[in-house]
Amino acid sequence: MARFRGSITKVSRRLGVALSPKAEKYLERRPFAPGQHGQSRKGKVSEYALQLREKQKMKYLYGILEKQFRNYYKKAVAQRGVTGDNLVKLLERRLDNVVFRSGFSASRAGARQLVSHGHLVVNGKKVNIPSFQVSPGDLIEFRQRSRNMGAVTDSLSKAPESRFPSWIQVDKANQKAVFLSVPEREDIQEPFNEQLVVELYSK
């Protein structure tokens, strides 16, 4: 599947939100948009621009390109409940996101690689599709040959217990996690407003 291969740091500066650990450190030093006039850009932002920016935030945070993101939106519309909430929940159930939330990788991009390279199993079966939808009760763990990889061990050792969300039970010692439940929207702390995205696609 195609992926964004540009500078995530530049995108982070343009959107004003850290999209990776590296970008977070960079934004602390240079909290303004890139380019010659990054520090002096002013003026009223249009409604469309605000909606587009929120969509870009969501796409880059979860590492998804436009076609797939629009498909998630269509699925969210088809489900019962609030469309925006449904959209966020679908993104949170992605396997690469659950791997990231479980502390197995310091970034979603790294988690995506772990999944794509076939290092993980779900309920005992190998899954190498980052977009795989995890369900309540699913057990995510590493294949025998992939256990105790340096990057994973390092990420887990640096992850405080407070990082792990209430809807995922993480066993750091055995490098496994159980997806307990689909999180409620208020439990997901991410810097975007999905309602503006819904308004954008509803036009």
UniProtKB/Swiss-Prot annotation:
Example GO molecular function term?
structural constituent of ribosome
The record's listing under Pfam families reads: Ribosomal_S4, S4
Q: CDD domains recorded for this chain?
A: S4
Provide the alphabetized UniProt keywords: Ribonucleoprotein, Ribosomal protein, RNA-binding, rRNA-binding
Signal peptide boundaries:
none
Instruction: List, for all copies, the residue spans of the domain called S4 RNA-binding.
Output: 93-173
- GO CC terms on record? small ribosomal subunit
Tell me the SUPFAM superfamilies matching this sequence: Alpha-L RNA-binding motif
Q: Name one GO biological process term.
A: translation
Family of the protein in this entry: Belongs to the universal ribosomal protein uS4 family.
**Summary of the function given for this chain in its UniProt record:** One of the primary rRNA binding proteins, it binds directly to 16S rRNA where it nucleates assembly of the body of the 30S subunit. With S5 and S12 plays an important role in translational accuracy.
Q: What name does the UniProt record give this protein?
A: Small ribosomal subunit protein uS4
Q: Kindly list the organism's lineage.
A: Bacteria, Pseudomonadati, Chlorobiota, Chlorobiia, Chlorobiales
Q: What gene does the UniProt entry assign to this protein?
A: rpsD
